[in-house]
A protein has these predicted regions:
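Conserved small/polar residues in nucleotide/adenosyl-binding loops
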Residues: 1-4
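ABC ATPase nucleotide-binding domain signature region
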Residues: 6, 12-15, 19-71, 145-146, ...
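Conserved phosphate-binding and hydrolysis motifs of nucleotide-dependent enzymes
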Residues: 11-16, 95, 116-117
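Conserved catalytic network of the ASCE P-loop NTPase/AAA+ motor domain
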Residues: 36-38, 105-108, 133-137, 151-152
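ABC-family P-loop ATPase nucleotide-binding domains
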Residues: 47-104, 108-111, 117-120, 128
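Short glycine/serine/proline-enriched coil/turn segments at secondary-structure junctions
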Residues: 81, 150-151
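Conserved D-loop/post-Walker B switch-helix segment of ABC ATPase nucleotide-binding domains
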Residues: 120-133, 149
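Conserved H-loop
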Residues: 139-144
Length: 161
């Protein structure tokens, strides 16, 4: 069982960390070799890029068919103020947008949670909150991240490319 297992991929810029994730997600990128995954494997993905986020959190939850109450409860655990729930996400900071994607991911039923640099734009306090959420939800995860403290706190096995 891979539940509660976390693998963190590290490596220098350009070593292929994000490309590896994209191959797993079946993105059409040039590669050699064969990539196979189990049939019916459901993956929840948090990309590096947050620039596409716009609209209210309520609209976002409806579009992505996630439980709005759970979504907002997770955001509250990451220090979102209730007043932010009605604001347009295009006005959110980069860190707030990253939290939206993390909360969305944790609301999605999946076999594997793939997060590409989830701590970009995240302050230390929020990092600790994210660590607590990972421990609470216990998802099987594949992450690209450079933060050694984070790796230790979520008890992730490290693979270096």
């Amino acid at each position: 069982c891979i539940r509660d297992r976390r693998i963190l991929i590290q490596g220098k810029n350009g070593s292929g960390k994000s490309s590896l994730l994209k191959l797993l997600l079946k993105y059409p990128i040039e590669h050699t070799g064969t990539v196979t995954s189990g049939s019916g494997l459901v993956i929840s993905y948090v990309p590096q890029d947050t620039s596409h986020l716009k609209g209210t959190l309520t609209e976002f939850a409806k579009v992505h068919k996630i439980d709005e109450s759970l979504f907002k409860a997770i955001l509250r655990k990451m220090d979102f103020e209730r007043v932010q729930f009605e604001k347009d996400m295009k006005d959110f900071s980069a860190g707030q947008k990253k939290k939206v994607l993390i909360a969305k991911s944790l609301c999605e039923p999946a076999h594997l949670y793939v997060w590409d640099e989830p701590l970009n734009y995240i302050d230390v306090y929020s990092r600790i909150q994210i660590e607590q959420l990972i421990r609470q939800f216990s998802p099987a995860m594949l992450l690209v991240e450079h933060d050694v403290t984070f790796q230790k706190e979520i008890d992730a096995k490290v693979i270096t490319l």
